[in-house]
C-alpha cells in the first residue's frame, strides 16, 4: 500500500486550483488578507458592496471578529434569486425518501424560490420579524431547506435542532435563544422507523423556560396521528399554500446573525454557536466550489443531517449559493440493505459524495460485495468529514467505493469554523491516507505545546489558528464571555480548536482527536459534562464520570463510570434503566456504550476527578496510567482496572 497518492495530471489540468495556483493564492491570502477576501466576496450578490473587509481582535479584553461589516446582502437571494435567469429550471434539490420504493422528487430553483417566498410571507403574517429566533426540528425533507432559507429571507435567525434529540434537549435550545416559533413535522422516517417529532415538541413545550414559543407550524409528512393544540399549532400547508410566491428579501448587514447552532461544550450546557451572514456565505460558497471542484452538471450528495453544521454549510448554503444540484437523502446507509448508499449514487448519477468515516467503517465491515454489485461509475470525487478517518477505511473508500479513480478530500473543520479549514484540493495536493493535508486559503494553523509555545517543523501538539477567516463564529449566543473563555483564554492571541494534531516532515496535518472534555461520536460532538449531569440527575446515582474510548465503527464511544447512592446495588435492570434515562433526556446519540459500576472514582486530594486515568482504564491501557501519586485513594484505580479487565 502506497502511503502517498500523487495528483492525477488529468485531474490537475481541469481542476479549479492546481499546485502552483494553490501556492500563489495561499501566500496572497496570508500576506494580503483584505485584498484576497475582498476579491473572493465578489462571488456573492450584494445590495451594498463591502469596503471594510476585516476587523479582528483576539485580545482577551476585546475579542471581536468582523468581516465585510459595511456590506449588505441577503443569503436567500444568493441561494435562489440570482440563479433564476440562467438556472431557474435547473434541479436544486433531488429528494430521495427513506423507503426505496417511495418516489423520489425534483425541485427546481424556481420552485424552491417560490416555496421559500411563500413560507417567508407566512412567517411575516405570524409576526416573525428580523432578529426573531425560529427553531426548526424537521426530518431530512425539502421543507427543511425551505424553512432555513425562508428564515434567511426575512432576517429571522434559525436554530435547527437535530431530529434525534429528545424533548429536554429541544427545550434547552428553545430556552437559550427564546424562539418565537417552531417548525416541525408530524413524524420523521429513518430506516423504516417513525420518529415522533411533533410529540417531542409537545413534550419540550411543557418544560419550564419554553414559554417564548407562540406558534408551532407542523408539516404533514407521514400522515401519522398527532395532537394539535389550538391556537398554538397550525398545519404548515394551510398557512403556507395560500401565500404569494414573491417575498421581498430583508436587507441584512454582513454581520447580522444568520443562525444559531448548538454544539456540545465541555461545561455541560450546549453553547449556541452564532454565525453571521456575509462572511459565512462567502466562505461556505468558496470552499464548496473549490474543495469539491464543482462543475455545472455535478450531482452533489452530502449525507449529513441538516441538524449539524455540515448540513447547514454543505447541503444548504454553500451548494445552493453556487447553483449546484443537491441530493437530499432522508434515509440511512443500511436500510433496507447495506447497498443503499451505492444504489442511490447509481440511481441519481451522483458525481460528488461527502460522508463520514463512521458510515465508511460500518459499510466496510459488510464486505466489498454490497458495493461491487453497483456501478458507481458516475462518481468523480469522494469526501470525508466529521472525524479523523483511519488509513484502513481511507484505502477501502478509495479502492472499493471509488474504484481507485476518485480522489478523496479528507476535510477538517468544526461547527465553530463555519466551513472547511484544512483539506486537500484535488488538482493541487498529493494525498496521504489519514491526513487532512494542508490548510485552505487564509487559514494559518499552528501547533502549540501545553505552555502555548509554538512548535516548528514536524511536531505533535494542540491545534490553534493564528488568524481569522470569514466563516468563523462570532460569539456564543447571549454569552460572549463563554466564547472568550472557551476559545481564546487557553492560548492567548490564538483560536484554540480543542483538537490534538501532528504535523509531518512534509507539513501535512494529522488530526489526533479531542483534547478537551468533548467526545466525537460518529462525527457528532457530545460534551461529557452533559451526559454526566444527566446520569447524576437519576435518583439512584450519586456520582458519574464519562470519557471517550476508541470505537471501531463510531470513532469514539461513550464509557460511563457510575457510583450509586448508598443502599442501591448494581443490576442489569438498573443498567438498562440508566441507558433509557440518558436516551430520554438527551437523545439516542448520547447513550453510553459501556456503564461500569464504580464504588468510588479516582480523585485528587482537592476532589477533582482524574479523567485522564479514567480514559486510560476505558481504553484498557493500564501501562499508560502515568502518575497516580496525587490521588486521594490510589487503590480505587486497581479496583476499576480489575472490573474493566473482566468485561
Swiss-Prot record:
Entries under Pfam families matching the protein: ACAS_N, AMP-binding, AMP-binding_C
Keywords: Acetylation, ATP-binding, Ligase, Magnesium, Metal-binding, Nucleotide-binding
Enzyme Commission code: 6.2.1.1
Gene Ontology MF: a single term: metal ion binding
GO annotations of cellular component type: cytosol
Cofactor(s) needed for function: Mg(2+)
Residue sites binding ATP per the record: 386-388, 410-415, 499, 514, 525
Catalytic activity, as annotated: acetate + ATP + CoA = acetyl-CoA + AMP + diphosphate
NCBIfam families: Ac_CoA_lig_AcsA (TIGR02188), PRK00174.1 (NF001208)
Annotated protein name in UniProt: Acetyl-coenzyme A synthetase
Organism for this UniProt entry: Xylella fastidiosa (strain 9a5c)
Gene name linked to the record: acsA
Amino acid at each position: 500500500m502506497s502511503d502517498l497518492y500523487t495528483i492525477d495530471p488529468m485531474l490537475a489540468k481541469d481542476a479549479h486550483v492546481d499546485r502552483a495556483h494553490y501556492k500563489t493564492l495561499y501566500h496572497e491570502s496570508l500576506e494580503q488578507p483584505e485584498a484576497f477576501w475582498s476579491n473572493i466576496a465578489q462571488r456573492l450578490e450584494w445590495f451594498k458592496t463591502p469596503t471594510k473587509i476585516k476587523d479582528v481582535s483576539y485580545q482577551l479584553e476585546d475579542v471581536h471578529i468582523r468581516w465585510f461589516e459595511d456590506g449588505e446582502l441577503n443569503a436567500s437571494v444568493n441561494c435562489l434569486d440570482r440563479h433564476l435567469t440562467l438556472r431557474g429550471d435547473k434541479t436544486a434539490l433531488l429528494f430521495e425518501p427513506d423507503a426505496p420504493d417511495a418516489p423520489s422528487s425534483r425541485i427546481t430553483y424556481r420552485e424552491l424560490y417560490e416555496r421559500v417566498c411563500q413560507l417567508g410571507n407566512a412567517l411575516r403574517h405570524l409576526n416573525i420579524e428580523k432578529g426573531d429566533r425560529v427553531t426548526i426540528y424537521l426530518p431530512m425533507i425539502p421543507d427543511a431547506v425551505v424553512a432555513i432559507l425562508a428564515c434567511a429571507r426575512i432576517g429571522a435567525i434559525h436554530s435547527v435542532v437535530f431530529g434525534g434529540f429528545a424533548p429536554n434537549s429541544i427545550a434547552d435550545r428553545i430556552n437559550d435563544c427564546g424562539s418565537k416559533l417552531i417548525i416541525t413535522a408530524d413524524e420523521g422516517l429513518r430506516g423504516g422507523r417513525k420518529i415522533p417529532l411533533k410529540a417531542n415538541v409537545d413534550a419540550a413545550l411543557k418544560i419550564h423556560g419554553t414559554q417564548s414559543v407562540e406558534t408551532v407550524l407542523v408539516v404533514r409528512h407521514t400522515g401519522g396521528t398527532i395532537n394539535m393544540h389550538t391556537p398554538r399549532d397550525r398545519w404548515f400547508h394551510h398557512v403556507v399554500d395560500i401565500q404569494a410566491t414573491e417575498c421581498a428579501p430583508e436587507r441584512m448587514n454582513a454581520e447580522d446573525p444568520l443562525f444559531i447552532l448548538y454544539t456540545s461544550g465541555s461545561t455541560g450546557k450546549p453553547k449556541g454557536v452564532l454565525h453571521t451572514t456575509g462572511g459565512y456565505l462567502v466562505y461556505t460558497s468558496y470552499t464548496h466550489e473549490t474543495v469539491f471542484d464543482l462543475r455545472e452538471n455535478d450531482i452533489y450528495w452530502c449525507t449529513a443531517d441538516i441538524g449539524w453544521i455540515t448540513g447547514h454549510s454543505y447541503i444548504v448554503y454553500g451548494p445552493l449559493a453556487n447553483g449546484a444540484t443537491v441530493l437530499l437523502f432522508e434515509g440511512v446507509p443500511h436500510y433496507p440493505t447495506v447497498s443503499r448508499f451505492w444504489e442511490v449514487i447509481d440511481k441519481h448519477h451522483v458525481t460528488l459524495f461527502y460522508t463520514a468515516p463512521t458510515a465508511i467503517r460500518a459499510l466496510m465491515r459488510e464486505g466489498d460485495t454490497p458495493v461491487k454489485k453497483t456501478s458507481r461509475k458516475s462518481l468523480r470525487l469522494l469526501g470525508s468529514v466529521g472525524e479523523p478517518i483511519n488509513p484502513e477505511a481511507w484505502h477501502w473508500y478509495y479502492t472499493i467505493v471509488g474504484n481507485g479513480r476518485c480522489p478523496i478530500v479528507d476535510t477538517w473543520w468544526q461547527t465553530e469554523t463555519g466551513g472547511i479549514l484544512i483539506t486537500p484540493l484535488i488538482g493541487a495536493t498529493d494525498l496521504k491516507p489519514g491526513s487532512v493535508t494542508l490548510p485552505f486559503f487564509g487559514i494559518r494553523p499552528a501547533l502549540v505545546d501545553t505552555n502555548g509555545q509554538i512548535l516548528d517543523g514536524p511536531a505533535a501538539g494542540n491545534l490553534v489558528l493564528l488568524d481569522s477567516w470569514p466563516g468563523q463564529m462570532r460569539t456564543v449566543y447571549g454569552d460572549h464571555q463563554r466564547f472568550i473563555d472557551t476559545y481564546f483564554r487557553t492560548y492567548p492571541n490564538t483560536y484554540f480548536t480543542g483538537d490534538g494534531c501532528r504535523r509531518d516532515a512534509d507539513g501535512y496535518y494529522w488530526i489526533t482527536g479531542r483534547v478537551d472534555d468533548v467526545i466525537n461520536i460518529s462525527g457528532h460532538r457530545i460534551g461529557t459534562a452533559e451526559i454526566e449531569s444527566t446520569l447524576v440527575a437519576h435518583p439512584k446515582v450519586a456520582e458519574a464520570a464519562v470519557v471517550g474510548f476508541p470505537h471501531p465503527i463510531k470513532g469514539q464511544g461513550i464509557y460511563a463510570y457510575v457510583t450509586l447512592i448508598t443502599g442501591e446495588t448494581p443490576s442489569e435492570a438498573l443498567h438498562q434503566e440508566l441507558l433509557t434515562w440518558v436516551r430520554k433526556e438527551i437523545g439516542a446519540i448520547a447513550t453510553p456504550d459501556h456503564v461500569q459500576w464504580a464504588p468510588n472514582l479516582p480523585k485528587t486530594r482537592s476532589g477533582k476527578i482524574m479523567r485522564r486515568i479514567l480514559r486510560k482504564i476505558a481504553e484498557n491501557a493500564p501501562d499508560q496510567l502515568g502518575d497516580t501519586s496525587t490521588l486521594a485513594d490510589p487503590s480505587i484505580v486497581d479496583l476499576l482496572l480489575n472490573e474493566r479487565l473482566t468485561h
